[in-house]
Amino acid sequence: MTPLTVPLNEAARPLDRLADFPAIPEGWAYLDTAATAQKPQTVIDAITRAYDTTYATVHRGVYQRSADMTLAYEAARRRVAGFIGAASPDECVFVRGATEGINLVAQCWAETQLKAGDRILLSQLEHHSNIVPWQLAAERVGAAIDVVPLTPDHAIDLDDMAAMLTPAHKLVALAHVSNVTGAVLDARRAAELAHGVGAKLLLDGCQAVPRLPVDVAALGCDFYVFSAHKLYGPTGIGVLWGRGELLEAMPPYQGGGAMIDKVSFAGTTYAAPPARFEAGTPHIVGVLGLHAAIDYVDAIGLEAIHAHEGALVREAREALSGLNSVRLFGPADSAGIVSFMVKGVHPHDVGTILDEGRVAIRAGHHCAQPLMDHLGIPATARASFGVYNGPRDVAALVKGIERVTRIFG
C-alpha cells in the first residue's frame, strides 16, 4: 500500500465546516470535491470585496489603487510560496490551472530540452492533462513515452518504476494523489529514482494540495502544479512551481504584455520569471481568491483535514465493502477519494439515482481513460470528501447505494 504522507490523527477527526459554505443547502451531500471544491464564505467575500471596493489593474498603473492591488497580488504570490515551501516567490507562476501549468512545462521545458530518442515516464493512473501534453511534446521532438504499471491496489508501483528507468529518461510526470483511486505517491522516493538517472520530476498536485501538507523542497521534485478551484478557491487560476534555475532557462510560453523586458522591431528581450510566463492581464481577483483559500485551509490545518477525510474514507469503504454488489478500487488509505462500481449497474445510473436522493458524486472515466482500460471497465462512481462533509454524508451515500441495488436487483 502507498504510505500516507502524514499519519492519521484521530484527535483531529471531528471536523465539519458545512456552515462555512453557503452553496451547500441543508440535506444535500456534496461528494464531488475531487472535481471541484465548494467555496467558503471567506473566499466569496474576498472576491466580492475586490470587485466592489479595491479593483484595479496590476503592474501597470501609477495611481494608488493600482499600486495597492499590485501589492495584494504579489502578497498572494508570497503566500503561495510559503504554503508549498518554495524557496522564492519568483518560482511560483500563476497559470489558468494545473492543465496549463503542465502544458507550459511540456512546451517550454520538454520541447527545448528533449531530443529524438529521449524518453518520458508516466503512469497508468494519470489524468489526461498529465498525458496528452507529453504526447504532443514527444511527437514534436521524437521522444518516446513509457508507462509505469500499478500495484494490485491501484497505486503507482515504484519498484517497477525503479526497474524501468534508464539514462534515456529525461522526465517523469506523476500524480501526487490519484484523482480516481486517491492513492498517495511516495513522492520523495519517486524524486530520488528520477534524479538517479538524471531525469526531472513533475508532480500533478491537484488532489494533494487540498488534502496533504506539501513542501516542494522536502519532496525533491522539479516542477509542481495545482489548481485553486480544488483548494476551495476560484476557477481559472492555478500555480506552476518550478526550480528557479529551470524556469530561468525556459523560453516564454506566450507573447504579450507583462512578459517583456524591451520590445523593438529589431528584437525583443524578455522579463525574468515568473513574469516571463504571465503574458497579458492576469486573473487578478482569482489570485486574491486563491490567497483567501490558502488562508482558510491553513486556519483549519492540513493535518486536521487529512485526518478528517481519512476517517470518512474508512467509514465509507467499510460500509460499502459490506454490500455484496459493490466493488471498490484503490488503496484503503486513499486520500479523500472512494471509487467504486455497483455490479450490473452503469456508474451513470448510480450517479443519477444518488442525485434523486440529494447525493452528488462523479460518474465516468474521470479523465483517466487509460486507467479505465487497465481496470477493464468503462467508468467508476466516485465519492470524494471535503471539510464540509461528515458521517451523515457517508450514511446518505450508503443509503443511496442500497436503493440502487434494490432498483436494479
Where are these regions (language model features)?
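Pyridoxal 5′-phosphate
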Residues: 1-409
